[in-house]
A protein has these predicted regions:
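His/Asp/Glu-rich, glycine-adjacent segments
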Residues: 4, 36-39, 53-175, 234-239, ...
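A short, conserved beta-to-alpha structural element at the edge of catalytic cores
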Residues: 8, 47-62, 220-236
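Acidic, His- and aromatic-enriched active-site or binding-groove loops in soluble protein domains
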Residues: 42-47, 72-79, 171-181, 211-230
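A short acidic (Asp/Glu
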Residues: 31-35, 161-166, 203-209, 382-383
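Metal-dependent active-site segment of extracytoplasmic phospho-/sulfohydrolases and closely related
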Residues: 20-23, 176-211, 370
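Active-site neighborhoods of enzymes that stabilize oxyanions during catalysis
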Residues: 234-425
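Short, solvent-exposed loop/turn segments at secondary-structure junctions
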Residues: 26-29, 72, 155-159, 200-202, ...
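Active-site-proximal N-terminal segment of extracellular/periplasmic enzymes that hydrolyze or transfer
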Residues: 2-49
Length: 428
């Protein structure tokens, strides 16, 4: 039986088929669509775009998709807004997977995940982790009770893309296809298989953004702890995984100037910060804009106010909404209209996604400023950068990283699914 708060309960095998739910970490929609064109996953329904929330990171995405508790921070090294200091780090990956190391309640729902040390080793020896994961998953699934759903999470795919690139992932999907054919033959039509991913990936040459160096040149002090002094130039920015965004924490009065200073740095696309109860500012080299949100009678709408230029490249979408009569007198259009118009945009579902990144609890300790990096750039730990050579990464709000996938053996899915609308299709 599955249940989630007020959501309806269903009994696997009685009101719907038993479900094998399999999450593949970091697999982009485009690679799965290409795999289908090569003849893999024959007999499945077409994959749909699953829009991952910004920053496009595993725990943020899965907590949204499964309506679970939010993680403390964007990564295991995070800034604690209560103590005003950076906490956490590599200790999460040492020892056993104890309750204090679980980032979100979605992990309580997993029937299979790799042993804790493999969460780090997957970025050192991804092929070995993938093969071991496949063997353990196959054995544990075959031994699981056949009258309930089974939820597995395979992280090897993320490591393969990060460290090896697209071709090893294509081969991994071939081996997965063979295994799933075996499972389908064994389980029959009584078991639905639903494949999905948490986020996509930007594949290609990845260069470091020299964020801390630039901020120091601009007169800021990089700190682990903020003392709260008015006018202080301290900036805390945790550096952990090699990813396509950065989370900055600073004094309230410095946000606008900080975002302005970052427009000059190579690799920075734009920054976002809250500037009102119902609006955020987007500021980048292409200009600045504000995203306004309005809720009336349970209906949510957004307005894109171009202050200077068009940092989100939404002029065409805005004109289309206007031509179709979907903008009201104040320039607002419904959230559904914006989503439908921008689901495949360079910044998928940009208005809701970016606004909610700062105004909903995607993490407990929300940043003062979120920096979106251009495709091909990363920020993170210098130590990790010396250990691995990146072939791909994720984290930003651009299409490649934001577009995950969902695909079912039994159901035709909508053309696109937002992360916060995914749970009924996955678990309920």
């Amino acid at each position: 039986m599955t249940t989630n708060g007020n959501h309806k309960q269903e009994r696997a095998g009685l009101t719907r088929p038993r479900r094998l739910l399999l999450c593949l970490d970091g697999v982009p929609f485009d690679i799965v669509r290409e795999a289908r064109e090569r003849g893999l996953f024959e007999g499945w329904n077409e994959p749909t775009r699953l829009l991952s929330p910004f920053p496009t990171m595993t725990n943020i995405a899965l907590s949204a998709m499964l309506r679970a508790t939010a993680p403390l921070g964007y990564e295991s090294l995070y800034f604690d807004r209560n103590s005003r200091e950076i906490r956490g780090g590599i200790g999460k990956y040492i020892g056993r997977r104890t309750p204090d190391k679980l980032p979100s309640s979605y992990m309580d729902e997993l029937d299979y995940q790799e042993p804790l040390p493999f969460e780090f080793l997957v970025y050192v020896a991804p092929e070995a982790v993938w093969r071991a994961d496949m063997r353990r998953f196959r054995e544990q699934f075959r031994n699981a009770p056949q009258r309930r759903d089974y939820f597995a999470f395979l992280k090897g795919t993320d490591g393969l893309l990060h460290i090896r690139g697209a071709e090893p992932l294509r081969r991994a999907l071939e081996s997965l296809d063979r295994l799933l054919k075996e499972i389908r033959a064994w389980c029959g039509a009584e078991t639905e298989i639903t494949l999905f991913s948490d986020h996509g990936m930007t594949i290609g040459e990845i260069r470091r953004v020299h964020l801390q160096t630039h901020l120091r040149r601009c007169g800021y002090e990089i700190v682990d702890r903020l003392n709260g002094r008015a006018g202080g130039r301290g900036v805390a920015l945790p550096a952990f995984g090699l990813i396509g965004y950065a989370a900055l924490f600073c004094n309230e009065e410095n946000k606008g100037k900080l975002a302005e200073d970052l427009t000059e740095l190579e690799g920075v696309d734009f920054s976002i910060y809250r500037d009102a109860a119902d609006a955020i500012t987007v500021k980048g080299a292409e200009g600045s804009a504000r995203i306004h949100r309005r809720e009336e009678d349970g209906r949510i709408s957004y307005r894109y106010e171009q202050v200077a230029g068009d940092p989100l490249r939404l002029t065409e979408a805005l004109c289309g909404l206007s031509d179709e009569g979907l903008l009201d007198d104040e320039g607002y259009a419904s959230a559904k209209s914006w989503s439908a118009r921008t689901a495949t945009h360079i910044y998928p579902d940009a208005l809701a996604n970016l606004y909610n990144a700062l105004n909903t609890e995607r993490v407990h300790h929300t940043a003062d400023l979120l920096v979106n990096l251009k495709d091909g750039y990363y920020y993170g730990s210098s130590l990790f950068a010396h250990i691995v050579s990146l072939k791909a990464t994720h984290g930003n709000a651009l299409r490649a990283s934001s577009t995950a996938f969902m695909m079912s053996t039994h159901r035709a899915l909508p053309e696109f699914v937002r992360a916060d609308e995914a749970r009924p299709l996955l678990k309920d």
